[in-house]
Amino acid sequence: MQKVSGSGKKTTAFQQRKSDSVYNNNEMNKGTSSISYDPVYFVRDASSFTKTTHERAASVKLKLEHLYKVTVEQTVERNQRRMDFEAKLAQDRGSEERKKRQLNSLGQKESQFLRLRRTKLSLNDFHTVKVIGKGAFGEVRLVQKIDTGKIYAMKTLLKSEMFKKDQLAHVKAERDVLAESDSPWVVSLYYSFQDSQYLYLIMEFLPGGDLMTMLIKYDTFSEDVTRFYIAECILAIEAVHKLGFIHRDIKPDNILIDKTGHIKLSDFGLSMGFHKTHDNAYYQRLFESKINTSTSSTQNSLMVDTISLTMSSKDKIATWKKNRRIMAYSTVGTPDYIAPEIFTQHGYGQECDWWSLGAIMFECLIGWPPFCSENAHETYRKIINWRENLYFPEDLHLSAEAEDLIRKLLTSADQRLGRYGANDIKLHPFFRGVNWDTIREINAPFIPQLKSITDTSYFEEIDTIPNITMNSPPVLQNKIPSDVDQNLAFVGYTYKRFDMMTQKGIL
């Protein structure tokens, strides 16, 4: 649009607006040259924000931190894999053309892995073959991945129970130790994912059952058999410690037998690392107020409730062993293998796992744990006062080396063998003749006889397992976590393992 000015010249609307603006500014400046302006301060008070705003801010902060952490870790891991592969090729006498093809193949696998990482897994990707275990927080199933036919053990955890029982830090630590480990002594984790109600851990299936089943069946082991299993347990515990974790729940139930008869550690639900997300206080701060927990839980979520057990003579030890399996599936668990310093809560380190090993060795040779009693509270009392309660039956004769090793493991933390590392235990005379580098290559004392890849004959039939379901009892409304809380607590739980994703027959 144009208009004619008083001088007869045509001006545009833009030129007119600019002229008016300059005029108005000049007029204003004439009378304001002496006026001073006070600065304006804005005070941001977070307390005035709504709960929803706080939750969203916390969620964004946590997700950004996780995104940055994962991006850096993936880049470092990818570069390290290439460097390791190049170092391996440098020692290969093959042609340069062949090496180049192998490097290109690695690059293709890396690209494929990145695409697969973005693929969301769900329960629909797996077919349940059989339920092989139940617990207070979930269950374990033998499953088959639909697109590949591969067999796994699927551990499911109920999210609401994790909140109620104050298990968030332990859940994260369990996932992390399984994801970080590539040791042959630790159960391999292939995937982890979640939905609105459950967490899922997809792990290797070990068809030989566990050490507890063997102890129930055979009562006791010879010293040679005990030496084999305890030596392998030492290497397994050492592998966990090297990752910077404390297992805290070493017991026969958590020592699994693979198809070759060798052991692997499992169930890191009470493990503790040194990352902030492995500390319950982190989640309490994250949610602003502490989530109510069960009255039976103690600090570190080690629960000790009364269990009706009877053991006043050898004849009644059979009753204890029968109830032993029931305890394994209960919310309470068994305190028989827990170190005294964990109960007293005066601080403890990795040496607490060596106490547990001593208790297992005692049971392998004697037939029952060293402090088993009529109930869990009595066991707790005996462990605290271990000096007055540790004794060896006179009618059972152990070698001097075996008894000495047990006594050096079942002692105070500051005197315990292994407090400076696993090598001190390996050097004990009881293990004279053990080749620590090749022990996994020798024939195990017991090798499972399997009929198929889905053979579960070494697992107890589910009908005989205590009826502990995944359904939670009614809870108060303030104990039910909000969707935002659940999202915050389990950010970063998803995982896929690279080495399995790139093998022939991609998962």
Curated annotation (Swiss-Prot):
Tagged with keyword Secreted: no
Lineage, highest ranks first: Eukaryota, Fungi, Dikarya, Ascomycota, Taphrinomycotina
Domain of life: Eukaryota
Start and end residues of each Protein kinase domain: 126-431
Segments for region (Disordered): 1-30
Keywords per UniProt: ATP-binding, Kinase, Nucleotide-binding, Phosphoprotein, Serine/threonine-protein kinase, Transferase
Role noted for this protein: Protein kinase that seems to play a role in signaling pathways necessary for cell growth and mating.
Catalyzed reactions: L-seryl-[protein] + ATP = O-phospho-L-seryl-[protein] + ADP + H(+); L-threonyl-[protein] + ATP = O-phospho-L-threonyl-[protein] + ADP + H(+)
Matching PROSITE patterns: AGC_KINASE_CTER, PROTEIN_KINASE_ATP, PROTEIN_KINASE_DOM, PROTEIN_KINASE_ST
Recorded GO MF terms: ATP binding; identical protein binding; protein serine kinase activity; protein serine/threonine kinase activity
One Pfam short name: Pkinase_C
A cellular component annotation (GO) from this entry: incipient cellular bud site
Protein name, UniProt field: Serine/threonine-protein kinase CBK1
Segments forming domain AGC-kinase C-terminal: 432-505
Name of the gene encoding the protein in the UniProt record: CBK1
Active-site residue numbers: 249
EC number: 2.7.11.1
Statement: the UniProt record of this protein carries the keyword Protein biosynthesis: no
Residues reported in the UniProt entry to bind ATP: 132-140, 155
Family: Belongs to the protein kinase superfamily. STE Ser/Thr protein kinase family. COT1 subfamily.
Annotated SUPFAM superfamilies: Protein kinase-like (PK-like)
GO BP term (any one): maintenance of protein location in cell cortex of cell tip
PANTHER family (UniProt xref): CITRON RHO-INTERACTING KINASE, MYOTONIC DYSTROPHY S/T KINASE-RELATED
